[in-house]
Amino acid sequence: MQDKYNHLDVERSAQTHWNAADAYRVTEDASRKKYYACSMLPYPSGKLHMGHVRNYTINDMLSRYLRMKGYNVLMPMGWDAFGLPAENAALKNGVPPAQWTYDNIAYMKKQMQAMGLAVDWSREIATCDPSYYKWNQWLFLKMLEKGIAYRKTQVVNWDPVDQTVLANEQVIDGKGWRTGATVEKREIPGYYLKITDYAEELLGSVQHKLPGWPERVKLMQENWIGKSEGVRFAFLHDIKDASGALIGDGQMYVFTTRADTIMGVTFCAVAPEHPLAVHAAASNPALAAFVEECKSGGTTEAELATQEKKGQPTGLFVTHPLTGDKVEVWVGNYVLMSYGDGAVMGVPAHDERDFEFAKKYGLPIKQVTDVKGQAYSLDAWADWYGDKQHGIAINSGKYDGLAFKAAVDAIAADLAALGLGEKKTTWRLRDWGVSRQRYWGTPIPIIHCDEHGAVPVPEKDLPVVLPMDCIPDGSGNPLHKHEGFHAGVVCPVCGKPARRETDTMDTFVDSSWYFMRYCDPKNSEAMVAGGADYWMPMDQYIGGIEHAILHLLYARFWTKVMRDLGLVKVDEPFTKLLTQGMVLNHIYSRRTDKGGKEYFWPHDVEHVLDDTGKIAGARLKNAVGDLPVGTAIDYEGVGTMSKSKNNGVDPQDIIEKYGADTARLYTMFTAPPEATLEWNDAGVEGSYRFLRRVWNFGVKLNAMNSGANGADAACAKGLFDKETKALRLEVHTLLKQVDYDYQRMQYNTVVSGGMKLLNALEDFKGEISAASLAALREGFSVLLRCLYPAAPHLTHALWSELGYAAEAGDLLDTPWPEVDASALQQDEIELMLQINGKLRGSVTVPAGADKAVIEAAALASEAFVKQAAGAPAKKVIVVPGRLVNIVV
């Protein structure tokens, strides 16, 4: 056994052993309890970052612990391999996205293996492999058959540089998230999935079927689905288009959740794309210019809520359905055509957005709800405008005096009687547009025929294989001009020459079901089969909070579609969800002469502290470029590790210098899994020192071990002296706590428990005998098993070197240690001793002592005799198991 801990040798040896044993390959076994634990599959960007290390270590600790607990554990890994970054890399480096992607996969896989992850690599998938995306295409065709997938033309966000559609979430301040180009509104055809058909179930399941999910994530999904109950009704008009036909059949529909305020309408606003806006703009240059301006504005509800409210009158009027009053129509930049009917009623007295708009343009404000008798006031308005729980209708004619619900019911009934409205439930959720004008994605299995239009590719011809030799040049989708992609393509209906669909699928499609493919990854005959019946639903899913809405919602929807098609039996894919915290580091920068920012690596910087020891600034401790040592720079606090801010830490550097076990241990010990982790180099050093202490104690114990390998046989009650019993009490007390912390996935306290356990072993001062050596060996075996999920390489080596493997087998499959109840039984207990309520010492009594024995021991104690100074005890209060208080 080596005297000094050499992490390189230890980790290389352990990984060689595991690989030779094919240690992590798992098969379905109906006789065993299963547990499926999975981290969200990574995008193969090139290198792992510390966020990856933290995520995968959380999963690995859970998997190893449960395997020791007897579970049949599946921990798979794969690659979310399609996406725009590969195309951007191709543009930059002149290599096909496929080559860039597979090179990155190979490198990142080596990094993961160096971490010692218990991954079953036989189940590895890459979403860019035709054997995987074939099933994207197959299910898409099934959705077409069932009417879940459909084609339509819709106004979309168009990035003119990337030549692609952007989701609302990818438009930031009117610009493309990647290119920064001003986003345009365009009408183009594309394929959509009817996720809205599942809105009610998706919402209901969030509320009732996901108890193992964080409340924060569930609330985010509820808000995204956005169920609203209200009234949809029409304003009448006689506005005609150029052909003389009434626009919208003479009706302009709106939806409101506040029908009780309908009598307070003083204007209406429509989206720039609304037919009335388009009609009015045709003869109004100022309005036409405003409509064009709106195209570069925000496209999400969040952006519209914060941007300045702007409008332009159309010169058109509609008729109020209940009063007959004429209501002016405006175009508003805060109205979305994609939500509701693209028009809203303006009730500035009782809606914050309408109020802001009306104040800006001097529009009338009419109060129609009285709240707690308060007089209407522009100053006090914001405090009560939305109080619908206590409002009473006023200035509303026949509805005066009605409370909110009664007013809504009465108004809805009157609108229905007129044939102009009805109660309705609406949803914020919109159908999922899956068409992308990009190359590196799953080809949509459609053939376009001049005679028969869009025709599905026959199942026998799947997969439609993506050409692997394309190198995007920035001029749009290269599939348009790739001759091989279209060569020999004929219409499945008539057999005439045709062309393939060149749009590819949104990459969220790839990640919406990959976790099911892990269950049966090599099956060429079925998308999923018996493996999914065994492993699904997933027991624990681990990933970042940034995926709370889109990925998790789409995965839930995809699962329900697969269930309805008879492919799986589960309603929800993920039983429990853990969203791990981000890894943060210090950020240092300075303004450049050109007004930009230059960021500095933390290893080049030292802090400047104020009188209280707080960070007041920073300066260079190493020369950087032309900047000398001592140059003052700005300290921006801590933030997420980022390449752009030079505050990332390369896991490879940590693994090479300290070892994978140190990287794993540090990321687990520093903060609970759900909390953010602030990087600290000193903490990494501390984790390494702890592992070195564990190794050193193993060396010491190995030297003490003179053939006393029968630890379990020697550990029998009655063979131990007082010090040894105290050691065993501490060992099994800590084991009980660590086991509980593993069950709660509180891995920071798991590691701290291991540290306390090592302290107890190191601090043992008893006489070394066969019995005490057996107790030390028992304690160290408990420590190794407790630390094994966090530091598998070191514990594997020590387990073997100290002879535990010869007794109990490979640590990988050694059962979790059992708490010895007899070790927790104490012969004596120590009670706090108080005199007149103040702590003065302690008293030791037999564990089963009654009150009389405890009182006698307390009164005879040295502490009482000294403090009482001869004064008699007036009263003795005993709190069993805790303290004795003597009143004198």
Curated annotation (Swiss-Prot):
GO terms for molecular function: aminoacyl-tRNA deacylase activity; ATP binding; leucine-tRNA ligase activity. It is an enzyme of class 6 (ligase). A motif ('HIGH' region) lies at residues 42-52. It comes from the Bacteria. InterPro entries: aa-tRNA-synth_I_CS, aa-tRNA-synth_Ia, Leu-tRNA-ligase, Leu_tRNA-synth_edit, M/V/L/I-tRNA-synth_anticd-bd, Methionyl/Leucyl_tRNA_Synth, Rossmann-like_a/b/a_fold, tRNAsynth_Ia_anticodon-bd. GO terms for cellular component: cytosol. PROSITE patterns: AA_TRNA_LIGASE_I. CDD domains: Anticodon_Ia_Leu_BEm, LeuRS_core. HAMAP family: Leu_tRNA_synth_B. Belongs to the class-I aminoacyl-tRNA synthetase family. This is Leucine--tRNA ligase. It comes from Polaromonas naphthalenivorans (strain CJ2). The gene is leuS.
